[in-house]
Amino acid sequence: IDGKAEEKVWEAAPFSESFIDIEGVKIPKYDTRVKMLWDDKNLYFYAELKEPHIWATLKQRDTVIFYNNDFEIFIDPDGDTHNYYEFEMNALNTVWDLLLVKPYRESAPVVDSWDIQGLQTAVSINGTLNDPTDTDKSWSVEIAMPWEVLKEASGSNDVPADNFWRINFSRVNWDHDLDGSTYSRKKDASGKFLPEYNWVWSPQGVINMHEPEHWGYVYFSTKPVSEEVAFTIPQDEQIRWKLYEFYRAQKAYFSENKMWAT
């Protein structure tokens, strides 16, 4: 794990389509793509993030990494929107990993002390880090997450061969200011931070990654890496989409009327 994808198996793995704005409308100003591999030990991720100014300041694990530009992974093994994982890392290879019992909308506890035992991560910089005197090209991340940890929320002891999980990827990017040679998040005239950009693999439709029902489907094929696989979303999943529409309507009704619709 070195932050690069120069091995033949990585070269054979296709990139995703370029990320899109989280609401699914605007095209991001910097390109982001991701690819994945798996074996019987780990789930592997590689992401390439184009950027002319690569900077990061946070060095303590489990701080709020998205206060820097970052790359994020969200994993819901059994697709029930409960007991899902969030992972974030910046260009300094500082990580934040946590377990969410339920989405924030349910006011459930967040297990910030949860760590991915055996996690391996690396960053590669195509340019310079924290140097505003030049123009950078990109930074890339490589990540290995052990199945032994990820399976804890899957309801199964097996690797999901020829099966799917709900997963999404996010990239948070900030406009920046410079104080001499030090980067920081840009503020408006009133001193408030400008809003971040949120670029994702599977659009959420809203500025909120914590609606797991909108995440994408990742299918774990047992075929050779270079062989294309046709994946069709099961009919049961389409029924589940309709049930989530009903759920959101009920939540909206309760918020306004302080009672459930009957």
Sequence positions of predicted segments:
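Short, glycine/small-hydrophobic-rich surface segments
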Residues: 245-262
